Structures are given as C-alpha cells and as structure tokens.
Amino acid sequence: MVALLTDTVGSPPVVSEETEQGCAGPHTSYQWDGAVVTAWAGTTAFVVGITTSSLGGIRIETTGGFAVGDDIVAFAAAAPAENVGHPSDSDTFVAFDVASRTSSGDYESPVGSVGYATDGVLQSIVTPGEWSSFLC
C-alpha cells in the first residue's frame, strides 16, 4: 500500500514511528498530503486514512461513490441507524460498504470504510475502519 500511494502521489511519505499513542498502540505512520497509512508493529494490519478528494489526480472515493468534500446528509438519513453516529450536533460518523451481519449480530467481515462529516460534509474516510478510528 505504501509503494502504491508513493507512486500515485509522486513523492515519498513522511515516516514516523510511535512506540505508544493512546489506544493505537505501537505503529508506523506513512503520511502524504491528504493520506496516511498506519501499520501496527508485529502485525500485517494497517488502515488508510484519506482527507482529500483526490491523490495524484485520481479521485478517491468509497465504493458507493462518496469522496471527501461530498454532502452525505441524504445518505446518512437513509442509512440504518446502527450505521450512523452523532457524537455532537454538527458531527456525524457513517459506515460505508458495511458487511452483512451474522445471526449473532457479528459482522461477517469488517466494515469496509467509515467517514467523518461536519455539518453534513465528508471530512475524512478510513478503511478498513470503525468509529474508534476517529476517536484515538
């Protein structure tokens, strides 16, 4: 993922090693303007965070077609209640590309991506992600 984003953006990332940071634990961050890859120490787990609508001239969007800067008010209003959170009057978390749940209520696979919006405008997307991606 780091090599792909480096090629797309056309420049290397700023790399930082964190031995401990809140609930994130030890990890390495690879940052470009508008994107970050966070990889956890000792695992193959990583997440990609996007805070721009395009990288290297390529539009970055969810499989549903949403990009940073898009209005998601109608989408959030139509989404199932468990896929939308409102931590404040102006802030909204919304899950995109949600996997189906098993009869026990667990997801068959992780949520595809989550977005954070202020006043209905998408500010960032994290994939794979969950609400805590924005709280740590």
Give the residues covered by each predicted segment.
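Short secondary-structure junctions
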Residues: 2-20, 76-89
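Secreted/surface-exposed cysteine- and glycine-rich disulfide frameworks
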Residues: 63-78
